[in-house]
């Protein structure tokens, strides 16, 4: 009888006081934590800027075009030029708009998006610079995965408020669409991760990433097969469901119903321009990067890869490669698939993905019980 991988047979989650992992960042001075947060958030903003360049280049290659190539070498300064142009635009406010809410709504989307980076580990070790021990994460919450999921759903408030405050029917309809879409797909997104929580016995993102650094060894007669313990191998269905739900949650094509240009002009941000529009724009692309980091850490081993144990920089490089690959699939979907109808969007969530993710949870739980000997088997 084939053996069950050890990763599926560990003890269940224990919630009794203090048995979960405690934050390893508590020994770091608070000023150093703020400095790390400042660096991480600025790196995220720079990454977001060049995500737009990357997307335009990939789409251009798919459509047999050149893409941005005028501003700087290979168009690498195009994001800077776009930002300057955007900030120079006139900031228009509809006459009948609720001005306070209109001002406030885009900021909600941006702040919620960038706050999510706080629980993403860029490595599972500490490094020493100028005699100071520095963590490669801002904070290590023992429920970091729940934090990411919760804040991912909070951004929809900024979209709904922006659509409502614009005094525009297209904007309001876009906001309502976004609310229904997030409610539907946030459930799918969370349930797709339950299998990982069962396997790793933790909700801490650092613990889940560390769990994947242990190789799985399978004996096949005289041969031995060694595979990385990445959860994409033990949870392939969950990974596919997570990816589809993540694309829908971030309002990206082919799930971009809240801003469908052919139906709603520009949806919830139809009336926004200049600086305030940039907050919506920043929020969307930052969410894409955060979700890609989330997927890389939970399913693809995070910083795990050849040579990562020798130098922390190699681990970060592996994490970056995985994020870029995940972002490529975002762009690939946009360049190849048409937008779904709204009834198709909801049907996929409730009639297809929800039953599949529940089956995945049940199968994972049964395998885990069988491996631990707690499930009576007829053989």
Where are these regions (language model features)?
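Selective transmembrane helix interface/packing segments
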Residues: 23-379
């Amino acid at each position: 009888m084939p053996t069950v991988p050890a990763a599926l047979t560990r003890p269940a989650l224990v919630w009794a006081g203090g048995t979960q992992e405690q934050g390893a960042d508590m020994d770091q001075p608070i000023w150093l934590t703020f400095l790390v947060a400042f660096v991480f958030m600025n790196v995220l903003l720079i990454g977001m800027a060049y995500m737009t360049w990357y997307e335009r280049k990939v789409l251009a290659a798919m459509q047999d075009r050149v893409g941005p190539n005028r501003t700087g070498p290979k168009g690498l300064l195009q994001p800077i030029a776009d930002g300057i142009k955007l900030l120079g635009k006139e900031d228009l406010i509809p006459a009948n708009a609720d001005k306070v809410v209109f001002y406030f709504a885009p900021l909600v989307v941006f702040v919620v998006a960038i706050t999510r980076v706080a629980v993403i580990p860029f490595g599972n070790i500490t490094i020493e610079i100028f005699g100071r021990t520095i963590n490669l994460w801002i904070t290590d919450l023992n429920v970091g995965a729940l934090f990411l999921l919760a804040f991912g759903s909070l951004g929809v408030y900024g979209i709904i408020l922006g659509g409502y405050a614009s005094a525009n029917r297209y904007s309001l309809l876009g906001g309502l669409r976004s609310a229904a879409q997030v409610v539907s797909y946030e459930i799918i997104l969370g349930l797709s991760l339950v299998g990982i929580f069962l396997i790793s016995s933790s909700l801490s993102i650092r613990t889940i990433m560390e769990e994947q650094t242990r190789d799985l060894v399978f004996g096949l007669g005289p041969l031995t097969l060694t595979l990385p313990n990445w959860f994409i191998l033990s949870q392939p269905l969950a990974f596919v469901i997570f990816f589809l739900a993540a694309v829908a949650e971030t309002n990206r094509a082919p799930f971009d119903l809240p801003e469908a240009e052919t139906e709603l002009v520009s949806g919830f941000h139809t009336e926004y321009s200049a600086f305030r529009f940039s907050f919506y724009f920043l929020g969307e692309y930052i969410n894409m990067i955060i979700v890609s980091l989330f997927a890389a850490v939970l399913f693809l081993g995070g910083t795990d890869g050849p040579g990562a144990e020798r130098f922390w920089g190699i681990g970060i490089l592996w994490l970056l490669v995985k994020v870029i690959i995940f972002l490529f699939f975002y762009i690939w979907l946009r360049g190849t698939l048409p937008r779904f109808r709204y009834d198709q969007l909801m049907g996929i969530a409730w009639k297809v993905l929800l039953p599949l993710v529940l089956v995945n949870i049940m199968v994972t739980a049964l395998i885990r019980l069988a491996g631990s000997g707690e499930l009576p088997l007829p053989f």
